[in-house]
Regions:
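A penicillin-recognizing enzyme superfamily signal
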Residues: 1-185
Length: 185
């Protein structure tokens, strides 16, 4: 069957979130003119959090995560690790020069009518779709790698500017073992 860019991006977002269910949003929070939050997409409670005395006298707050676990965290991390290879060695390698921790997957439909890229960092999943409302070829050699990856690269470079580079979160019990690509050792 068919899917949408939003559903596909949500699925990749689930992987990078350790296999936990996510709900995409366009608006995360709305505050009134006095700084009071009147809408918050993230409904998790922060029990015991109080900023009245400032944060310095409190331990780091812990948010209760009640999201459904959709896949095993280890399996999700393995998928993320494989998709990281798309950036390092595959069809997304043109943006590896950004010096960010990224992963993703390109896609191109038959006859090059659509090109897409779903990419993510440890904190943000983004879907890019390039195509016409009435399907027709994008052009010779126009693929997800050539039309969608550069758009993702421009966006993620801007969105990540000034933020610390962090690795993908590895669940407990996962050991990384380097394997030589030619010898398998």
């Amino acid at each position: 069957g068919e899917t949408t860019l939003l559903r596909l991006t949500t699925a990749y977002g689930m992987l990078v979130n350790g296999g936990k269910e996510i709900t995409p949003s366009l608006i995360d929070r709305v505050q009134d003119r006095y700084g009071r939050t009147i809408y918050r997409h993230d409904a998790r409670d922060c029990s015991g959090c109080s900023v009245a005395d400032g944060w310095s006298s409190q331990p780091i707050p812990v948010l209760d995560d009640t999201r459904q676990q959709l896949t095993e965290p280890t399996s999700a991390f393995q998928m993320v690790s494989m998709l990281e290879g798309v950036i390092k060695r595959g069809t997304g390698r043109r943006i590896d020069k950004l010096d960010l921790v990224m992963a993703g997957k390109t896609g191109t439909t038959n006859d090059n009518t659509n090109g897409w890229f779903i990419g993510f960092t440890p904190d943000l999943a983004v879907g890019v779709f390039v195509g016409y409302d009435t399907p027709r070829a994008l052009g010779k050699r126009e693929t997800g790698s050539t039309v969608a990856v550069p758009i993702f690269g421009d966006f993620i470079a801007t969105a990540s500017a000034g933020k610390p580079v962090i690795p993908f979160r590895r669940p407990g019990g996962v050991t990384i073992i380097p394997v030589h690509s030619e010898t398998g050792e």
